[in-house]
């Protein structure tokens, strides 16, 4: 289910920009400035829709559904004809990332003999999992139901994203593999997880203005951390303030303001490797607007 802003009157000569992102504390934190009108842009009005990331991935593939949308990097080649990546607003794991967890100790070689619950086949977590071992058997489960499904014995293991990376141990689960650690050891790079894409048809001027607005919103949240975190707490599933702050720090930081040359290289490396391994059927054409 998606949550949308209540409709408001749009003044004449105002461009309405639809923004969609996930209902996660890190996304809420970075969009705090725009969502609460702390950041305003003359001539532009921003509307916000909150959807789970797999829904956003699929909507952006079917059509240019939103002007700006959060996506998993894995999904980008499928929507690159209509969207380009923004140079800010992304989340990367620098030596950490999605995890395979289980209710019992498992060796890595055991994974090929079981079914693994995954949060969606368009997530970057799934792409990284398949690069790690393309033979693994998976089944899609809503991301917030993966831990309960493991606890109930429906799956021997699951691939967790979002806040589950911090709460799995309190649910009695054991970490089998951190894909962010594996990726760093394998490539020497950070693991790019999600970013924001903007509709190509908006044009260069709007691209520049909207990119700056998002960058200003991120900077505002970083500069007013306590207020932004208070706002984000309403989206922090099962996290207390301490854990929510830790989670936000993991995924909203200087890299969110700008990936940097090495961050952009990591995005290209991830997608190129997915294409070379036959996981992604479309050759990635990665470009950015700033």
Regions found by a protein language model. Give the residues of each.
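Hydrophobic residues within well-ordered alpha-helices
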Residues: 59-62, 150-151, 210, 274
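Secondary-structure end/capping motifs
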Residues: 203-273
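Hydrophobic/proline-rich hinge and linker segments of small-molecule sensing/allosteric domains
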Residues: 85-108, 184-201
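Bilobed "Venus flytrap"/periplasmic-binding protein-like clamshell domains
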Residues: 14-36, 97-157, 161-163, 265-269
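A structural signal for short loop-to-beta-strand junctions that line the ligand-binding cleft
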Residues: 17-18, 82-91, 115
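Pocket-lining segment of extracytoplasmic ligand-binding domains
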Residues: 144-233
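A local structural motif
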Residues: 39-50, 132-145, 280-286
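Beta->alpha turn/N-cap motifs
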Residues: 52-54, 60-77, 142-143, 160-166
